[in-house]
């Protein structure tokens, strides 16, 4: 991959339909904790919310779209989600 290829894959801000996928332990407060963090840091499109459990029920995936305004905002979201203690991965 060349430098040109890498630069062409950068996100252009603002990105009005930025997908966020959060994977964490299944618990009663997981989705609410994810939504609370996201709503604190970004404008969230709640209509895009999708929630799915793993086949054994141990993990839950929450997926939705936000309006992403900067790389700093995305880093802050990632840090805040991980700080909840529920989250294993943010994609």
Curated annotation (Swiss-Prot):
<dbReference type="InterPro" id="IPR007454">
    <property type="entry name" value="UPF0250_YbeD-like"/>
</dbReference>
<comment type="similarity">
    <text>Belongs to the UPF0250 family.</text>
</comment>
<protein>
    <recommendedName>
        <fullName>UPF0250 protein PSPTO_4820</fullName>
    </recommendedName>
</protein>
<dbReference type="Pfam" id="PF04359">
    <property type="entry name" value="DUF493"/>
</dbReference>
<dbReference type="GO" id="GO:0005829">
    <property type="term" value="C:cytosol"/>
</dbReference>
<dbReference type="InterPro" id="IPR027471">
    <property type="entry name" value="YbeD-like_sf"/>
</dbReference>
């Amino acid at each position: 991959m060349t430098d040109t290829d890498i630069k062409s894959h950068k996100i252009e801000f603002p990105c009005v339909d930025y997908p966020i996928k959060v994977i964490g332990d299944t618990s009663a407060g997981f989705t609410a904790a994810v939504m609370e963090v996201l709503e604190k840091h970004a404008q969230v499109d709640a209509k895009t919310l999708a929630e799915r459990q793993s086949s054994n029920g141990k993990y839950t995936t929450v997926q939705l779209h936000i309006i992403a305004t900067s790389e700093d905002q995305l880093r802050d979201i990632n840090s805040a989600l991980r700080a909840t203690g529920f989250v294993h991965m943010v994609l």
